[in-house]
Amino acid sequence: MAGVFRFSNAVSDIEKFIQTYRSIYEHFYPLTQTGHYFGHKEAYEFLATNGLASSLGAIGQEAIRRSERDDTSRDPLYNQHKMYSEIYRMLGWYEPGSMKTNFNLPEYGDYIAHSDPATVAKLFALNVLHIVSPNPLTRIKGGNILRPFPMIMKIMGALGGYLTRDEMIISVLACPDDRDDNYVSNVADKIRRIRKAGLKDLQAEIDSLKARVGINSKDALPNYTRFPIAAMKWTGWAEGVTTRDLYKGVSVTSLRITQSGEDVLQRISQAVDIRFEDILKYPCDAQAAFSIWSNLYQLKKVGFDISNYSEIIPQLESTAAPIFAEYRVKEYSDMLFFGYQEAPRDILKRGNQLIGE
């Protein structure tokens, strides 16, 4: 049985989260180009020294001194970067190094590091939509089969545009398999029943979930929502509101979908959703060609000029023809799949060989 999709408790300030990555990229990119990786220690020392991370009220070398523990799991600075790194990997901004605790900076990182703010905002929106489990680039605890952000949008759409934090926990983060065609309607019916019954029933559902997955801390489940709630607001897809309309006149805080969010919901509802595991049955070159094609497809939508690849794209489509045929990619108005974020590095490397890069 699937557990709870776990976002690390590191990120509620999306602007800082992005700027921190850009600083990390500029500092460590030359190192990674020599074939070396960087770990949590190198990263947090850089962040603390440059005032981008603090520990126990201090920055710089004093923060590093105060943070050091014999047990790194209790080291505040170590854990700050560890939690950032978990989401950077979900977004495709970090890729695995030689072990779980070190990292490489991918080709895609250059787009995040060097694009203008408006473009970075579009890329971030693209990336959060493509967070997925399972993912060959990172192990996401919980064992869910899930794209969490499209699921958030679909459930909001089914519930009149509103979703509270605890409702997000019991519906989105606890979703075992988003490919169940009945899941959204079933969980929306469940939440409507809970809203009618009152907040006690919502709390009972939370308590039941905690017991099932073995969580004792009262803060753990709410902490998993910090990033998705912040991202929904930062992208402009939702706004935070206080309302008495959901729970019998009781005032609760909730996300409310915006017109921008409605537009995204309509788009993803009409998209073909492909996961890397879907294309594993095809030859390596077909997987690679499709992954590279998806990168160009998504970057063009964001606004990048891909005209230099105009002669290569038909070759990629030919090599990946069985995938295009099975999933009827061109019959849909949109697609959910982004190779930079979802394909293994060896597949992208092979894809670059196919296009002569």
Which positions does each model-derived feature cover?
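Donor-sugar nucleotide-binding helix/loop cap in glycosyltransferases
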Residues: 1-356
